[in-house]
Amino acid sequence: IDKKVQRTKNRPLACNLISVKLALIYTSVLCSLAFLILIQFNILTIFLGFASMVLAFAYPFMKRITYWPQFFLGLTFNWGIVMAWAAITNNISYEILILYASAIFWTLGYDTIYGTQDVADDEIIGIKSTSIKFKNNIKLFVSFCYLASSALIIYLFYSKFGLNNFSLLVIIYILSLVYQVIIFEKNDPKKCLRAFKINNFSGLFLFFGIFLIN
């Protein structure tokens, strides 16, 4: 698939800079190292670690079978939130599930923006994405995702810390999402990429907003 998409055709595997065999060896080494790290934690975290592998190996195939691969990316990419909490507390609380859900909506939004760059190629080769499913109402869909993410974060902070301790950095996180919706245009790949890259800072604001209040 990467060979047929303008944005991804120069990736190492797609342009034969490395072989599939070498990629598999490299992946095996990384998985082995990850396993050695994983078994240092409690049983719950180890279980969650193995569960994450199911998501990680299933995700690359989602574009072939569903218009919601970005949702599966959200489940997979943010699984570390739950694992980190389990590693520290040896439990899974409702607060961390709220944070996980917020992160899923965030990922669903920003990866829909990212995928907009590839809509023309994706439609030709027959793969699916939320960027294609909602291409006629993409700003509305991304706005909904970001609104859901923001609402869950606000609820989490309010229930956990109260309004008096609400973090300015979390407000900046929310405003950065609003700014993305304003600037990206579905027919302008450069603006889509620019909006997507803002999420590097969005995540940083959210991290420090949570970290500093604790």
Where are these regions (language model features)?
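Extended hydrophobic alpha-helices typical of membrane-associated regions
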Residues: 155-214
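Alpha-helical transmembrane segments
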Residues: 95-106, 162-169
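Intramembrane alpha-helical segments
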Residues: 11-98, 155, 176-186, 201
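Multi-pass membrane catalytic core of lipid/isoprenoid biosynthesis enzymes
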Residues: 1-49, 105, 124-164
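Alpha-helical transmembrane segments and their lipid-water interface positions
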Residues: 2, 6, 110, 114-115, ...
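Membrane-embedded alpha-helical transmembrane segments of multi-pass integral membrane proteins
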Residues: 33, 55, 102, 145-152, ...
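Membrane-embedded alpha-helices of multi-pass transport/permease systems
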Residues: 44, 108-124
